[in-house]
Amino acid sequence: MAEEKTFEENLQELQQVVSNLEQGDIPLEKALTEFQKGIQLSSELQETLKNAEKTLTKVMQDNGEETNLDLGTDGENE
């Protein structure tokens, strides 16, 4: 099984995909493949960020109970 890439590696790969597509000098078939790859990477990155946000919004109280911390999100989540 392949080793899972880090968030930073996926982000760098997505940036490269976007750069390739912006240049516009690649064949249509490759552009479609790159676009699909970019969508998949974007989805993976969003999931990683969502999980990180869930982790960061939990605060341990003195008695050891977890409570959610309201960071004033803009309502785009769930």
From Swiss-Prot:
GO cellular component: cytosol; exodeoxyribonuclease VII complex
InterPro entries linked to this entry: Exonuc_VII_S, Exonuc_VII_ssu_sf
Catalytic activity reported: Exonucleolytic cleavage in either 5'- to 3'- or 3'- to 5'-direction to yield nucleoside 5'-phosphates
Protein name as it appears in the record: Exodeoxyribonuclease 7 small subunit
Keywords: Cytoplasm, Exonuclease, Hydrolase, Nuclease
GO annotation, biological process: DNA catabolic process
Class in the EC hierarchy, top level: hydrolase
EC number(s) given by UniProt: 3.1.11.6
Transmembrane segments: none
Role, per record: Bidirectionally degrades single-stranded DNA into large acid-insoluble oligonucleotides, which are then degraded further into small acid-soluble oligonucleotides.
Homology family: Belongs to the XseB family.
Upper taxonomic lineage: Bacteria, Bacillati, Bacillota, Bacilli, Lactobacillales
Gene3D superfamilies, per database record: Exonuclease VII, small subunit (1.10.287.1040)
Domain of life: Bacteria
GO function terms (MF aspect): exodeoxyribonuclease VII activity
UniProt-annotated location(s): Cytoplasm
Coiled coil segments of this chain: none
Principal location: cytoplasm
Any Pfam family matching the protein: Exonuc_VII_S
Quaternary structure annotation from Swiss-Prot or TrEMBL: Heterooligomer composed of large and small subunits.
